Amino acid sequence: MSKFWSSLAKQVDPYIPGEQLNDDTIIKLNTNENPYPPSNQVIQAIDEASKNLRLYPSPTVDELRSEIGEMYGLSQDHIFIGNGSDEVLAFSFMSFFEPGNRIKYPEITYSFYPVYAKLFNISTDVIPLNDDYTIPVEHFYNSEGGVIFPNPNAPTGIFLEIDQIKRILENNPNQVVIIDEAYIDFALESAVTLVEAFPNLLVIQTMSKSRSLAGLRIGFAIGNPELIIGLERIKNSFNSYTVDRLAIAGAIEAIRDKDYFLQTTTKIIESRSYLKEQLETRHFDILPSQANFLLVSHKEVNAEVLYQELKKQGILVRYFQKPGLENFLRISIGTPAQIEKLLKKIDHIIKPSP
C-alpha cells in the first residue's frame, strides 16, 4: 500500500476479472466471450474507420444510437452509449443512486455491483437468493435507493420472466430499477418492451457477448429520455469521447448484420443445450441457464480441484471463491470442437485410468 494513495484508493476492493492468458493453445471458457469472430462486414467497417483515426469520434454517437433505437422501435433519445457496459453501469450508479439510500441487489450476482457501491459510497441491502438460486421478487419491492440485477442473472444464468420484472417496477415507482441484460440475446424477452411504460426503468446491454465485440468495448443503456440525459451529464463530466471510431463502426455493422447475429446466437444456444445434456450424463448438477454459460457442480469432484485440473490440461473455466459458489464452476459456451475437448478432459479427470 503506497503512502501516496488517497483514502479511497486504500479502501476499495477492485473487481477481479477472469484470467486472460497470452497463449493461443489455451481454450478460454472462463469469461463468457463469444467463441465466434465478428462477421466480415464488421471487420471491413472497422478497417474503413481506421482511415480517419486522426479525427475525434462523435461525442454524441448519433448514428449508433439511431441503429440501436431502430432495433427496438425507439427514438435515439432513449439510448446512451458507453465504453463497455461496465462503464455504463458505473455512470448509472453515479446518476441514479444516492449515498445514504440503500440499493437492493442479489447476494449472488455480478461482482462489479458491490465494487461500485463501495467506490461511490452507496449503501446496500443485499438480498439472498431462494434455495433454487432464483431471485425472490417480493424482496426487491419498496427499495430506499433503487434496484439493480442482471437478467439472466450472472453467474447463475437463471432468467426472470418479464411479468416479474414488471412487479418490481410497479413496487418501486420512485426509484430507478436497472436491469443488466448482458446475456439477453441468449434468453427470452428483453425488458426493453417495458421502457415506454415505466419511466423508472433502465436497461443496460453490451456488444461483448452476442455481437462478438468484447475487444472493442461497447455498452449501451435504454430508458426514458430523462434518464439518458442524466447519464450524459455524468459522462460529459468525465470524458466527452468515451467511445472510439473503431468501436462505433464495428457496433453499427454488427447490428446491421442480422443474419450473422442470428446464426451465431443460435449455434451458441444449441451448444448450450448439448453441453448441458452431456454434463448431466456425467453426474453434474446444472442450473437452468439462459445465458452463454452454465453454472455447474459435480456430485463427487470438488469444484476447485476440477478447475485446477482443467487448467493444467489447457482449459480455463471460472471458479469463484465466494460463499454460495464454492462448489460451482461457470463454463462459457464454446464452439462444438472446444466443447468436445472439454468433455474429453472432464472424463479424464472424473474417470481416471486404473
Swiss-Prot record:
Keywords noted in UniProt: Amino-acid biosynthesis, Aminotransferase, Histidine biosynthesis, Pyridoxal phosphate, Transferase
Family stated for the protein in its record: Belongs to the class-II pyridoxal-phosphate-dependent aminotransferase family. Histidinol-phosphate aminotransferase subfamily.
SUPFAM superfamilies referenced in this protein's UniProt entry, alphabetically: PLP-dependent transferases
NCBIfam families: hisC (TIGR01141)
Biological or metabolic pathway of the protein: Amino-acid biosynthesis; L-histidine biosynthesis; L-histidine from 5-phospho-alpha-D-ribose 1-diphosphate: step 7/9
Gene coding for it: hisC1
Pfam families: Aminotran_1_2
The species this protein was found in: Oceanobacillus iheyensis (strain DSM 14371 / CIP 107618 / JCM 11309 / KCTC 3954 / HTE831)
Cofactor: pyridoxal 5'-phosphate
Protein name: Histidinol-phosphate aminotransferase 1
Oligomeric and partner information: Homodimer.
